[in-house]
Amino acid sequence: MLDIKWIRENPEKLDEALASRGIEPHAERLIALDLERRSHVVEVQCAQERRNSASKEIRQALAAGDQKTVERIKAEVEEIKTFLSSAAIKEKRLTESLEKILSAIPNIPLDSVPKGENEEANIVIRHFGTPPTFNFIPKEHFDLGQNLKQMNFERASRLSGARFTVLSGALARLERALGQFMLDVHVNEHGYEEISLPLLVRDEIVYGAAQLPKFSDDLFRTTDGRWLISTAEVPLVNLVNGEVLHESDLPLRFSSLTPCFRSEAGAAGRDTRGMLRQHQFWKVEMVSITTEEQSLIELERMTECAEDVLKRLELPFRTVVLSTGDMGFASCKTYDIEVWLPGQGCYREISSCSVCGDFQGRRMNARYRKDGDKTLHFVHSLNGSGTAIGRCLIAILENYQQADGSIIIPGALQPYMKGISRITA
């Protein structure tokens, strides 16, 4: 959530930033509503002060035996009580109206973010590896998996409907190995703390991560009003919800392996075949909680951590900085890492690393105190995929496929595969 004080002081910057995201101006409406709310608060404060002074005047009038004055002031106090009663309702309504609008406004892109309407304006900043060449036409992952008889979409559909997959045998082991490998890299070598999390969270937790109210249609909700997590970012970033930290405790770096659940309401007709876009998938997530001064440094570090996973797996990838029209709601800068998929003949997103500034910290009321400074500051938060396991499995199948349909296991994963170096039918 944005700071209304910043909006009052920078209305043009707000509207320019929103325009770069393809969103209509909001500054005038927000400032008018905020002015009405603040003016009303002043009226309430004046009424409360008058009520307090009236009590003193009543005591003085009683002492002087001036009953007429007592009755007049008592009548005035009753009017003030009536006003304050209705004023509380109005103040609540104004505050809720302001917060409703603020909660629907995305974060402000940093100046270093390229301006553009969509992914066409994204900028590639680096490559790793060279896409492999084959002496045969490379297959897509779903053909490879089904030919191996270890990837079954028909059974998954019978169990759960569209956009689910059943893996078996060595492919199921490969999926598990990827999660263990990624966690080991991030925890043992990158300094993240491993966290085991609930998969069901409450409204305020999803709101704190800036996924409510805007993305409610993309989420699954249980009958008791809780939400299945769409990413481990949601509970991880909220580990500091409502807390006051000390600067010396930061950064906090968390990593977690969880299933993720998404309705994919906005993806109708896209990637309908295979595992690229599923209602349920595994992902290793990274979250950092840090200070304003360190947040951009942390973004570069987090992105390098995600890239390191793909480098160890020797998968070709490129890293792009997203444009203002393509970046996520809570982000003020995002790097996407896109892995090469020979079967599709293109790069596809496998990780997204974002810095959110104090956007989530403000929603969560998560703050920190600096040495010698009594002022509390909202924490800055970052999140990144480290990486999406299903998409990494897809990349391994397509990049390591052989002419006979078998799959070579990357060397980094073989210790997790109990001696399996090649997957065959």
UniProtKB/Swiss-Prot annotation:
A GO molecular-function annotation: serine-tRNA ligase activity
Swiss-Prot/TrEMBL keywords: Aminoacyl-tRNA synthetase, ATP-binding, Cytoplasm, Ligase, Nucleotide-binding, Protein biosynthesis
Binding-site residues for ATP, renumbered to this chain: R262, S263, E264, E349, I350, S351, S352
InterPro entries in the record: aa-tRNA-synt_IIb, aa-tRNA-synth_II, aa-tRNA-synth_II/BPL/LPL, Ser-tRNA-ligase_type_1, Ser-tRNA-synth_1_N, SerRS_1_N_sf, SerRS_core, tRNA-bd_arm
EC number from the UniProt entry: 6.1.1.11
UniProt-annotated binding residues for L-serine: T231, A232, E233, E285, S385
Compartment(s): Cytoplasm
Paired cysteines (S-S): none
A Pfam family: Seryl_tRNA_N
Entry GO terms, CC: cytoplasm
Pathway stated in the Swiss-Prot or TrEMBL entry: Aminoacyl-tRNA biosynthesis; selenocysteinyl-tRNA(Sec) biosynthesis; L-seryl-tRNA(Sec) from L-serine and tRNA(Sec): step 1/1
Domain of life: Bacteria
Subunit annotation: Homodimer. The tRNA molecule binds across the dimer.
Family assignment from sequence similarity: Belongs to the class-II aminoacyl-tRNA synthetase family. Type-1 seryl-tRNA synthetase subfamily.
Domain commentary: Consists of two distinct domains, a catalytic core and a N-terminal extension that is involved in tRNA binding.
Role according to the record: Catalyzes the attachment of serine to tRNA(Ser). Is also able to aminoacylate tRNA(Sec) with serine, to form the misacylated tRNA L-seryl-tRNA(Sec), which will be further converted into selenocysteinyl-tRNA(Sec).
Protein name: Serine--tRNA ligase
Organism whose genome encodes this protein: Bartonella bacilliformis (strain ATCC 35685 / KC583 / Herrer 020/F12,63)
Gene expressing this chain: serS
